[in-house]
Amino acid sequence: MLTSDSLSRRHFMPLAAAAAASSPFVAQGAASQDGYLKGRLYKTLKIGMVKAGKSLEEKFALAKEAGFDGIELNTPGINVEEVNAAIKATGLPVDGSVNSSHWQVRHTDPDPAVRAKALESLKEALRQTHAVGGNTVLLVVGKGSDGPEEEIWKRSIENISKAIPLAAELGVPIAVENVWNQFCYDHEGDHNQTADKFVKYIDEFNSPWVGMQFDIGNHWKYGSMGDWIRQLNKRIIKLDLKGFSREMGKFTKIGEGDLDWADVRKALAEIKYAGWA
């Protein structure tokens, strides 16, 4: 999934189309040496990126015209009837959603009452996503500042696991995103870190209904994204994209910065990834 700064109506169409067509990751002519990725990636973006358009239908239409194949919403909180009407009118599907409360109401919170609210939010996100035809709910599991890693690891897995039966019933996987939340990596560490902890964390759920929505730009500061992709392998069920510059120490537009996109494409071909990005 492409991420970017806010776009006005005047700028949305040309910039979004350019991003969709010429990104070093999704560009049709820059797939991989053997061409494996060509035709296997579906471009999507978050609804919050589409600043132009007053109605949901207008936003969907703009995204489709810009060349995107799908769109992600924020759940819970959507009007299911309105979303389905926008899908029908534009032909643009909802490929998934982002659990809208996961930063504030966390599965790592030491308060059981807060974790119960986080669980209900996740369950409702799964229901609403299913109701509009989406196939994933992106989830940030919490924050490392909520306690020692061993404790938040255990409590988050226990809490999220309670939603797995519903995810399986609806056919909507829970997609854990790697973010700067001081969990499963060393936030003050160097750029030689691996995805070992993320692999272990996902595997402890022991369920095909929990995987990774891997953000390629988020952890370039901390390790080789190609190698992380190789480690995570089939645990990756969806991708998010952004650029990052180690030299400048900040996020960048896709194609800028120093992220090794060539190795990323090679790694994705090696694991035979196909799906949303």
What are these regions (language model features)?
Residues G77-I78, S100-S101, K143-G144, W180-Q182:
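Conserved beta-strand edge residues that scaffold enzyme active sites
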Residues K64, S161-D258, A262-R265, E270:
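Acidic/histidine-rich catalytic cores of soluble enzymes
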Residues V132-G144:
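Mobile beta-alpha loop/short-helix "lid" or hinge segments that flank ligand
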Residues G275-W276:
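Substrate-binding cleft of secreted/luminal carbohydrate-active enzymes
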Residues K88-G91, D111-R115, R155-S156, Q193-A195, ...:
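Short, hinge-like loop/turn segments at secondary-structure boundaries
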Residues V80, Q104, D146, F183-C184, ...:
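Generic structural signal for helix capping and beta-alpha/helix-loop junctions
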